[in-house]
From Swiss-Prot:
Region (Disordered): 243-309
Domain BAR: 18-249
Stated name of the protein: Endophilin-A2
SUPFAM superfamilies: BAR/IMD domain-like, SH3-domain
UniProt organism field: Rattus norvegicus (Rat)
UniProt gene name: Sh3gl1
Length: 368
């Protein structure tokens, strides 16, 4: 920095201290300017929070959002073009229904109904994905651009204006000790910065119809999503009602138990036949995947000591996305990298991928 630049920084710092500590009066900006500055500040805060809340509306699970961010980061590191999408709850429900519907088979009314409902839920997930894309393109991206460009530029102009005001007030306070030409130049720069900042704020506030159009695009995308969702659910409701009518009209099959096979008294006694009924998991608002949650631990095999970064699997881990490394309890995994505080990258059976830290016990840590 030049000597002139250092002097200017000293002038501004000195004036700021005299105003904050000594109570000195600085040059006051007019009320219209202050009113515009206030409106721009409110607009900036509104846009920032609306962006955050819109993303939460589209992708409500914070753990899934964090995991998706991590997966996208890993994809960029590996040079992968296709990034995994957000796991829509409708899609997860649909996959569950389809899987169990197939297990029950075509002879089960409930199984057929689960297949119908599952396919409809998967269609709802596809429509929700389309909503995400539409809202991102026509609402989130334009608002983000407003934050990154226009509002950021206004903040730059206001910061520059404040610096020139401090420089002008310092020189004005020392009028007579500082050359008149230097004071005149400081005043011109201050007025120039004020005009630039004022113009940029005025342009933003006068063109807020653009933000209204973007908000309208958000509502249009929501309407389109809900129309398609209603159509899918109405079709599903008709299918299920038809299945109820068909099942009710069929005669009930009579059940005739088969006689028990004779057995010798010397044979081992067996418990009565039956089938286990798995208890339904308790659903809570926070039952989605969390990096800190740990399943119930079952005893695992002891492993020999190692001389390279490695860990032992405490629980089974089923990969849900490309790039994840699946393993079974007791598997010994070689550690190659730590993605973040919740995820490792490692190798097992010649395959590389990443996995949650909470599913393993580190035996030999990675070098710092």
């Amino acid at each position: 920095m030049s000597v002139a630049g250092l002097k200017k920084q000293f002038y501004k710092a000195s004036q700021l201290v005299s105003e904050k500590v000594g109570g000195a009066e600085g040059t006051k900006l007019d009320d219209d300017f202050r009113e515009m500055e206030k409106k721009v500040d409110i607009t900036s805060k509104a846009v920032a929070e609306v962006l955050v809340r819109t993303i939460e509306y589209l992708q409500p699970n914070p753990a899934s959002r964090a995991k998706l961010t991590m997966l996208n980061t890993v994809s960029k590191i590996r040079g992968q073009v296709k990034n995994p999408g957000y796991p829509q709850s409708e899609g997860l429900l649909g996959e569950c229904m389809v899987r169990h519907g197939k297990e029950l088979g075509g002879e089960s009314n409930f199984g057929d109904a689960l297949l119908d409902a599952g396919e409809s839920m998967k269609r709802l997930a596809e429509v929700k994905d389309s909503l995400d894309i539409e809202v991102k393109q026509n609402f989130i991206d334009p608002l983000q651009n407003l934050c990154d460009k226009d509002l950021k530029e206004i903040q730059h102009h206001l910061k520059k204006l404040e610096g020139r005001r401090l420089d002008f007030d310092y020189k004005k306070k020392r009028q007579g000790k500082i050359p008149d030409e230097e004071l005149r130049q400081a005043l011109e720069k201050f007025e120039e910065s004020k005009e630039v900042a004022e113009t940029s704020m005025h342009n933003l506030l006068e063109t807020d119809i653009e933000q209204v159009s973007q908000l309208s695009a958000l509502v249009d995308a929501q309407l389109d999503y809900h129309r398609q969702a209603v159509q899918i659910l109405e079709e599903l409701a008709d299918k299920l009602k038809r299945r109820v009518r068909e099942a009710s009209s069929r005669p009930r099959r009579e059940f005739k138990p088969r006689p028990q096979e004779p057995f010798e008294l010397g044979e081992l006694e067996q418990p009565n036949g039956g089938f286990p009924c798995a208890s339904a998991p308790k659903i809570t608002a926070s039952s989605s995947f969390r990096s800190g949650d740990k399943p119930t631990r079952t005893p695992s095999k002891s492993m020999p000591p190692l001389d390279q970064p490695s860990c032992k699997a405490l629980y089974d881990f089923e990969p849900e996305n490309d790039g994840e490394l699946g393993f079974r309890e007791g598997d010994l995994i070689t550690l190659t990298n730590q993605i973040d505080e919740n995820w490792y990258e490692g190798m097992l059976h010649g395959q590389s991928g990443f996995f949650p830290l909470s599913y393993v016990q580190v035996l030999v840590p990675l070098p710092q």
